[in-house]
Amino acid sequence: MTTTGNLAVVAFDAADIEKLAAFYAELAGWEISDKDPDWITVRTGDGQEIAFQLAMNYLAPQWPGQEHPQQFHLDLYVDGYQAAAERAVGLGAKRLADGQTWVTLADPAGHPFDLVQKDGVGPGMELFAVTIDAPDASALARFYADLMGMEVTYEGPEGALIAGDGKSVMFQQVSEYNPPRWPDPAYPQQAHLDISVDDLDAGEARALELGASRLEGGGDTFRVFADPAGHPFCLTA
């Protein structure tokens, strides 16, 4: 497998990134590791990074419909998911749905996330996976696995999972999938992946070969693409 890049960070859009970063830091027991006016990074207990990007014209997802659908969500492991869900609501989340061993909530910016029971996790929460919606979960999993040098570790009717270097990305099969159409403000991105590469030209060639499309924007240290499902992502150097 040819490795082009490494998953650096997943970034969620929001109109109030200080509020959103503080929410996840307090809820999950994570650390705010970097703070700029338009970008705040939170580091998990095992060193993974989640960022919050300022988007003044942010349009929140309206789960579970597909008119303005969720695009990404976080799956968080916690020991005592019901108590954690109550605490999340107290911090500004909204309870959306209950499963057998998980609760789906919306964070203060409207992004859905799942709290999933896992015995022995703590004291902070554990990031199990970033989950990305797709019309063909297996195909999108293979795209990112090849792009980031990860392995497809699960494929099933509900989705697919890739893993590598201590990180996991899940792809959720969605019927009547409605993609983002960045930079169209009527169909904006809600989140994106930053993938680090040693060489932007070589990284771009590999991404295009695998089925990505080049989008507007970029600079000396990053370029913007859409994956085969329409989700924007950045290659960074």
Give names to the regions the model predicted.
Residues 2-56, 83-84, 90-98, 103-104, ...:
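Core segments of cupin and vicinal oxygen chelate
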Residues 7, 70-72, 189-191:
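Eukaryotic phosphotyrosine signaling hubs
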Residues 11-13, 75-77, 131-133, 194-196:
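Short hydrophobic/aromatic beta-strand micro-patches
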Residues 99-121:
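Short, structured interface segments
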Residues 117-132:
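Solvent-exposed, charged amphipathic helical/linker segments at domain boundaries
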Residues 46, 107-109, 227-229:
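Residue-level recognition of short loop/turn positions
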Residues 115-121, 173-175, 235-237:
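Short beta->alpha transition motifs characteristic of CBS
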